[in-house]
Regions:
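Active-site rim helix/loop that mediates acceptor-substrate recognition in acyltransferases
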Residues: 1-14
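Conserved acetyl-CoA binding element of GNAT-fold acetyltransferases
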Residues: 36-49, 103
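Conserved beta-strand-loop-alpha-helix junction that forms the acyl-donor binding cleft
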Residues: 76-87, 106
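Conserved GNAT acetyl-CoA-binding A-motif
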Residues: 61, 68-80
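Conserved acetyl-CoA-binding loop-helix of GNAT-fold acetyltransferases
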Residues: 43, 47, 53-66, 89-93
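Conserved acetyl-CoA-binding loop of GNAT-fold acetyltransferases
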Residues: 92-101
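Glycine-rich acetyl-CoA-binding "A-motif" of GNAT/NAT acetyltransferases
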Residues: 15-21, 86, 99
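Conserved beta-strand in the GNAT
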Residues: 11, 18-27, 41, 46
Length: 109
């Protein structure tokens, strides 16, 4: 675990210390679909393609979850691109439930 002010990074390493994957969470003041404020948010997670579907991502999420429970949090939130169905399925496999869908807008100035 690597900690910053409101960000924490998690590394999954092989026995020889080569990286298998990483995840980053931050504490947000608000996140769509979440009930608590502030709320921990899974900003990103990446697993080496050779090690996907072997429990590395689940282990990272479980480690994060345990730490957050110890800190008194009651939920972990995340997001995924609306077209990324693979990510939706992985999130569900890790115990996340979809809360809402949002369309973002931008105006060029």
């Amino acid at each position: 675990m690597l900690e910053g002010e409101k960000r924490t990074g998690y590394l999954a390493l092989r026995p020889d210390h080569a990286p298998l994957g990483f995840a980053e969470i931050c504490i947000r003041e608000y996140a769509n679909g979440c009930t608590a404020q502030p709320v921990p948010f899974l900003e990103g997670i990446w697993i080496d393609p050779k090690h996907r579907r072997h429990g590395v991502g689940r282990a990272l999420v479980e480690s994060i979850t345990g730490d957050l429970i110890e800190q008194g949090f009651h939920e972990l939130c995340s997001d995924a691109d609306i077209r990324n169905r693979r990510s939706h399925q992985v999130h569900q496999n890790w115990g996340f439930a979809e809360t809402e869908r949002v369309v973002y807008f931008r105006k060029v100035l």
